[in-house]
Amino acid sequence: MFALSGYEYLLGFLLLCSLVPALALSASKVLRPSNQGAVRRTTYESGMEPVGGAWIQFNIRYYMFALVFVIFDVETVFLYPWAVAFHKLGVLAFIEALIFIAILIVGLVYAWRKGALEWS
């Protein structure tokens, strides 16, 4: 047998990860019914008749709350592996994490002072 380095496994994994969704999407396109009637083009409202238009305006405050949520959600994603390996990383990694948290807190205070978190 051939000895594979880590790159061949990575290439195979990426190929498999690209191939499976492509096959699933092409299979669904081949197997789906092709009826494009007027009822099929209407929106589905949990079995109810649609009320109003589909294009409505949302308040910009929803966007601001979502943006702040995403920022702190990404912070959690970055800090979780750090917290798991904290005892192995040492003091320098602790200081770097504190700087990272401080930058995010400065951003939160800025958003708070600008009124991005106030619903008025």
UniProtKB/Swiss-Prot annotation:
GO terms for biological process: photosynthesis, light reaction. It comes from Acaryochloris marina (strain MBIC 11017). It is a multi-pass membrane protein. This is NAD(P)H-quinone oxidoreductase subunit 3. It is found in: Cellular thylakoid membrane. It catalyses: a plastoquinone + NADH + (n+1) H(+)(in) = a plastoquinol + NAD(+) + n H(+)(out); a plastoquinone + NADPH + (n+1) H(+)(in) = a plastoquinol + NADP(+) + n H(+)(out). Belongs to the complex I subunit 3 family. GO terms for cellular component: NADH dehydrogenase complex; plasma membrane-derived thylakoid membrane. PANTHER family: NADH-UBIQUINONE OXIDOREDUCTASE CHAIN 3. The lineage of its organism: Bacteria, Bacillati, Cyanobacteriota, Cyanophyceae, Acaryochloridales. Its main location: membrane. Signal peptide: none annotated. It comes from the Bacteria. Keywords: Membrane, NAD, NADP, Plastoquinone, Quinone, Thylakoid, Translocase, Transmembrane, Transmembrane helix, Transport. The chain crosses the membrane at residues 10-32, 64-84, 89-109.
